[in-house]
């Protein structure tokens, strides 16, 4: 038996972000196509969430949470021949790093150096809590040890410049299943936000606005406690992947998706799919002709005012441009084939 270990940070029914969604798609669509799939094991390098249920993982997939039994992790990694990382942490994990000679493929969902650069370049972000532990120097060294690096974003990245050899781009995919027309709720001025609390996602720009937030309430409270942002006009809902559909049907029409250095932007695709008008960052898919782009809090506030002034036809024209760009990523079969090829080398 030639054991191969897949490493990730989260998956199953406890989805916390786009990387977890990507991992779930890999396990559902790619893992069953791998040769001798029973030889592939899943190491979830985190604590087991209280609400995690194994039934949401593919039947027959052997899996293990690192903190359930660290010794089991060591045994797996010691016995295996290959390690493929579906989604890595952004800092040193000694129990993984010890086996660097077995590293084969790493899928990169965000480039740590770009995350740090985005925070450092914008004074207001430097004052906010940085939710994710990041060590850019180590992360670059970590990426360099793999035989292959796969960038899953649709946006360009300097990672490819830093690691030009055996680094490939296989963008994520998104299937449009709702295809709702642009809602007229845009006119009520309410704004939605459905993502993790990270400094680069600028949830604080919703201060002085009204609407709804779907996220981890603990992280949001930390932001409030450590800043002057009260977000008192926003109604907050605890993140649960099962609540997302109903959240996106609420009576708001504008969606805050102006995240800095967003690699793929799964929630931006979701906003368009649900007929919401996203405000996006100037650095996201800049090749697309789209009017509602910002890079500061002031620009965000002015953009909301502009949206409310614009006609419904003007808004529809813009969201149509955005969706035409997004549709080219709506090809699951092509994605499966490319990811399978990438991991098999």
Question: Locations of the language-model features?
Answer:
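A short, glycine/small-residue-rich beta-strand->loop->alpha-helix junction that serves as a flexible
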Residues: 8-25, 50, 199-201
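Short beta-strand->alpha-helix junction loop in the catalytic core
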Residues: 112-114, 155-156, 166-181, 219-220, ...
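Membrane-proximal helix-turn-helix segments that form the acceptor-binding/catalytic region
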Residues: 113-151
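Conserved catalytic-core segment of nucleotide-activated headgroup transferases in glycan assembly
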Residues: 176-179, 184-230, 236-241
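Short alpha-helical segment that forms part of, or immediately flanks, the ligand-binding pocket
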Residues: 245-246, 268-273
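Nucleotide-sugar-dependent
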Residues: 255-268, 282-290
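Short hydrophobic beta-strand element within catalytic cores of glycosyltransferases
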Residues: 276-281
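A charged, aromatic-enriched C-terminal amphipathic alpha-helix characteristic of glycosyltransferases
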Residues: 295-301, 309-344
């Amino acid at each position: 038996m030639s054991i191969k270990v897949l490493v990730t940070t989260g998956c199953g029914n406890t989805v916390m972000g786009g990387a977890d969604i990507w991992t779930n798609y890999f396990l559902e669509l790619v893992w069953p196509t791998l040769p001798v799939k029973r030889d592939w094991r899943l190491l979830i390098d985190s604590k087991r969430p209280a609400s995690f249920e194994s039934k949401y993982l593919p039947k027959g997939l052997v899996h293990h949470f690192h903190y359930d039994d660290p010794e089991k992790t060591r045994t797996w990694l010691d016995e295996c021949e290959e390690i493929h990382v579906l989604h890595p942490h952004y800092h040193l994990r000694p129990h993984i790093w010890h086996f660097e000679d077995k590293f084969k493929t790493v899928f990169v969902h965000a480039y740590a150096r770009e995350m740090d650069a985005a925070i450092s370049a914008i004074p207001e972000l430097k004052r906010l809590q940085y939710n994710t532990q990041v060590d850019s120097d180590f992360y670059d060294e970590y990426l360099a040890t793999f035989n292959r690096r796969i960038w899953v974003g649709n946006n360009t990245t300097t990672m490819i410049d830093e690691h030009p050899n055996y680094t490939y781009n296989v963008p994520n995919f998104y299937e449009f299943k709702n295809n709702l027309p642009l809602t007229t709720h845009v006119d009520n001025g309410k704004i939605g936000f459905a993502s993790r609390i990270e400094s680069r996602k600028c949830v604080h720009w919703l201060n002085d606005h009204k609407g709804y937030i779907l996220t981890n309430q603990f992280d949001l409270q930390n932001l409030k406690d450590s800043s002057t942002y009260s977000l008192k006009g926003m109604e907050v809902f605890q993140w649960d992947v099962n609540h997302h559909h109903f959240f996106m049907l609420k009576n708001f029409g504008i969606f805050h998706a102006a995240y800095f250095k967003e690699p793929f932007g799964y929630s931006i695709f979701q906003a368009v799919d649900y007929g919401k008008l996203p405000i996006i960052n100037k650095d996201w898919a800049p090749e697309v002709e789209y009017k509602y782009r910002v890079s500061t809090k002031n620009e965000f506030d002015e953009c909301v005012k502009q949206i409310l002034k614009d006609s419904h036809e003007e808004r529809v024209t813009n969201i149509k441009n955005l969706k035409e760009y997004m549709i080219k990523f709506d090809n699951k079969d092509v994605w499966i084939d490319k990811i399978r090829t990438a991991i098999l080398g």
